Curated annotation (Swiss-Prot):
Its main location: cytoplasm. The gene is accD. SUPFAM superfamilies: ClpP/crotonase. Its cofactor is Zn(2+). Pathway: Lipid metabolism; malonyl-CoA biosynthesis; malonyl-CoA from acetyl-CoA: step 1/1. The lineage of its organism: Bacteria, Pseudomonadati, Pseudomonadota, Gammaproteobacteria, Enterobacterales. It is an enzyme of class 2 (transferase). Zn(2+) binds at C29, C32, C48, C51. It catalyses: N(6)-carboxybiotinyl-L-lysyl-[protein] + acetyl-CoA = N(6)-biotinyl-L-lysyl-[protein] + malonyl-CoA. PROSITE patterns: COA_CT_NTER. Its EC number is 2.1.3.15. Signal peptide: none annotated. It comes from Yersinia enterocolitica serotype O:8 / biotype 1B (strain NCTC 13174 / 8081). This is Acetyl-coenzyme A carboxylase carboxyl transferase subunit beta. Residues 287-303 have a biased composition (Low complexity).
Amino acid sequence: MSWIERILNKSNITQTRKASIPEGVWTKCDSCGQVLYRAELERNLEVCPKCDHHMRMSARARLHMLLDAGSEVELGSELEPKDILKFKDSKKYKDRLSAAQKETGEKDALVAMKGTLQGMPIVAASFEFAFMGGSMASVVGARFVRAVEQALEDNCPLVCFSSSGGARMQEALMSLMQMAKTSAALAKMQERGLPYISVLTDPTMGGVSASLAMLGDINIAEPKALIGFAGPRVIEQTVREKLPPGFQRSEFLIEKGAIDMIVRRPVMRQTLASILSKLTHQPQPSVDGVKADAAVADNPGDA
């Protein structure tokens, strides 16, 4: 035994261990860098309580946020994508599909459901951005059309949350065809006088923004959502000019009249219920607690 070990009895030395924290307990805000408790962030509908940054949200979480609990019935869940073209870039398309399905638990990039919103029958669809960038392909178009057909059958409104990079290049013309297919389906909604509300979230780009996302009777956007056809960097390289600050963000678009409203996520459900009740000539829903729909205050400074 060395002299220092004799001086410092091992029994008196406290052994310290690095605390192990399970993955997914904490996360960081993409905007302000604040470290956030994951469970609290989920209660806040993925909105940072410090800076009010609206983070990306899964398709199912959006639909569960919107529809009354226990009323949800999924539409088109049996539809699955196929690699008809046997497409391969740096990776086979079928392998990309398998990886995306494993990561998200979804078969493709759109989830559609029917249900009720504060007692009103509605049909809702939502893009899953984590699935290949929410790209629009054959199954996405088919599910959206299924949602439109259900709304026509039930004589009720349709709400769609868009979050997409555009058409899926691995399906080539079949993905581009969905722009016309979904637009034609929405024309039937217009003929019947049924409301279609489009909610644009970050990001809504490419073929989705050029079709179903901008065809709403009312187009709503979340704060600071990136909305456009080509991305800002592509435009800058093409026109060789510096774009103005906030270009293609929802605040810029509402100034130019491209969208109708900007609505924060905590009050989105109540806002949609209020709009749809007016458009369908139903009694105005109760507003006893717009804040009951989320744990985030209307003013982030109050949180």
